[in-house]
Regions:
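Membrane-interface helix caps of multi-pass small-molecule transporters
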Residues: 27, 52, 76, 80-85, ...
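Helix-loop interface residues and adjacent transmembrane-helix termini in multi-pass membrane transporters
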Residues: 31-34, 56-58, 84, 242
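Membrane-helix/interface signature in polytopic inner-membrane proteins
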Residues: 153-193
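Transmembrane alpha-helical segments in multi-pass inner-membrane proteins
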Residues: 199, 203-253
Length: 253
């Protein structure tokens, strides 16, 4: 029984973390209809930034925020290459993904793996320390679930705003956005920034769970996240009360 519970716990821990990435890819793939391959580069970007900051003694929660911002900037670059320089969506993602290899190596000072064992992380500092001993062993599950829930709530709230509705429209009907005196290209850049920010945040959380960063960890992440979105939306497409972000998270689990 203990083995089964342990396996189930690990499934949900990984599922919650990758669910954050899946929600980000949902924005770019489903909402924006943009096949964003830069995800394979921004995921390890979040890991490398987090490992570098925690090794230097920075607050682990601050490392998560910085990772999100860095991922968003990478997403902006992908959008600018596509919107302003008229480079195709696939090639824009490939260029940024390739560039991230050099950026990540620069952050880790040339090391492919950057461990930070026995350092402070979001899983062993702050409010986690006051958890009762009986549930302390589930701290990773609890923290990862809370982080996922926060991202999901914020994303759901954003998609209900005027900017969020324009973001949806920019993917489905760019001409409508133009008729509203808005720039669909700018909305595309915003969408890619949000998507890659979530991806880098997921990388940041996973690196703190593993207490190390690996620049090769991004390989296949775009396939995994797309599979999560497709599986979730396909299985629960007829469930009207379920939000798309929830479907993406369930698909990741």
């Amino acid at each position: 029984m203990d083995v089964f519970i342990g396996i189930l716990t690990n499934i949900f821990e990984e599922g919650f973390i990758y669910g954050i990435m899946a929600m980000g890819v949902y924005i770019s793939y489903k909402v924006m209809d943009f096949p964003d391959l830069s995800v394979d580069g921004t995921f390890p970007l979040g890991m490398c930034i987090t490992a570098s900051m925690i090794t230097a003694g920075a607050d682990p929660l601050l490392a998560c925020i910085v990772a999100f911002i860095a991922g968003s900037l990478a997403g902006c670059i992908t959008g600018i290459l596509n919107v302003k320089l008229k480079i195709t969506d696939l090639l824009s993602g490939i260029l940024v993904m390739t560039a991230m290899w050099s950026v990540n190596l620069a952050i880790t000072k040339g090391s492919a793996v950057l461990p930070f064992y026995n350092k402070s992380t979001i899983f062993n500092t702050g409010l986690v320390q006051i958890l009762p001993e009986s549930i302390y062993k589930y701290r990773i599950l609890i923290v990862a679930g809370l982080m996922m829930l926060i991202v999901k709530i914020l994303m759901d709230l954003y998609l209900k705003t005027k900017s969020g509705l324009l973001l949806r429209a920019a993917g489905d009907n760019p001409q409508f956005v133009t008729s509203m005196s808005r720039n669909p290209g700018a909305m595309k850049i915003i969408g890619l920034a949000i998507g890659n920010g979530c991806t880098a945040l997921a990388g940041s959380i996973l690196s703190q769970q593993n207490e190390s960063a690996n620049i090769t960890s991004g390989t296949g992440m775009v396939v995994m996240s797309l599979a999560s979105v497709i599986i979730g939306t396909s299985i629960f497409s007829k469930v009207k009360f379920m939000k798309a972000t929830t479907m993406a998270v369930i698909g990741a689990i």
